[in-house]
């Protein structure tokens, strides 16, 4: 006879518990997930540059700005789709005109700046590159709300190492030296303003031994290379957050 009270208590405690797989439990889990996502403020990213930033010869999803946001969000961040102001063939002067035309008034949580390869390719002066790059960098800092650590300057890849560069008929040693000189300028400007510098030039030189890192046009870089760039650039984002 004493078994019945104990059995009654057992049923009362355990028989009424919800199955984790029940619709009610699923609704609770979904609500908790939604609440967690809503609790993380959405962050914004502005990418300024040229063909390397826009991801010439690869899909948008494979370009480093979009890959970067995807990877950050997979790690628990909440970034909106990046805003990209970039076009194949742009020099620093072209990018200056583009950002002025864009009339950017919004502040971004993070800004990247990668430009200069077309200055080198077109034989433009390093002095004009310095002054124009400095202006672009100052604007980038302003777009980041005046926070230098929320900006990264990304080095210029050495296109002379690509299949196109090898077949171009140009002096590849001269290309390498010129790219190094332009990178010395953008690195110095970044350092002077306390901006994070990201070197992707060394990574990009791997095209010499890995054809899979080059896009089909033989000049630009594949999605695989953009992914390697992201591994380097994400360090700058981590420092800013």
Locate the predicted segments by residue.
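Sec-dependent signal peptide recognition
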Residues: 1-9
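Short active-site-adjacent helix-start/loop capping segments
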Residues: 55, 91-94, 119-122
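Serine-esterase "nucleophile elbow" of acetyl-processing enzymes
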Residues: 22-88, 98-106
């Amino acid at each position: 006879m004493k078994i019945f009270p104990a059995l009654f208590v057992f049923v009362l405690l355990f028989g009424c518990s919800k199955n984790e797989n029940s619709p009610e439990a699923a609704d609770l889990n979904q609500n908790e997930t939604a609440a967690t996502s809503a609790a993380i403020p959405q962050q914004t990213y502005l990418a300024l540059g040229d063909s390397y930033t826009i991801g010439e010869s690869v899909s948008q999803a494979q370009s480093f700005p979009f890959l970067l946001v995807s990877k950050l969000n997979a790690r628990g961040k909440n970034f909106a789709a990046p805003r990209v102001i970039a076009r194949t063939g742009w020099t620093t002067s072209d990018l200056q005109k583009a950002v002025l035309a864009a009339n950017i008034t919004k502040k971004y949580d993070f800004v990247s700046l990668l430009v200069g390869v077309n200055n080198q390719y077109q034989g433009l002066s390093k002095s004009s590159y310095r002054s124009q790059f400095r202006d672009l960098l100052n604007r980038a800092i302003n777009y980041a709300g005046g926070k230098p650590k929320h900006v990264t300057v990304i080095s210029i890849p050495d296109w002379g190492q690509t299949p196109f560069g090898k077949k171009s008929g140009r002096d590849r040693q001269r290309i390498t030296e010129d790219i190094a000189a332009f990178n010395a300028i953008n690195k110095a400007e970044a350092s002077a303003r306390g901006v994070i510098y990201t070197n992707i030039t060394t990574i990009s030189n791997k095209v010499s031994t890995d054809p899979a890192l080059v896009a089909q046009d033989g000049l630009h870089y594949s999605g695989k290379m953009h992914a390697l760039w992201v591994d380097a650039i994400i360090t700058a984002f981590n420092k800013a957050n």
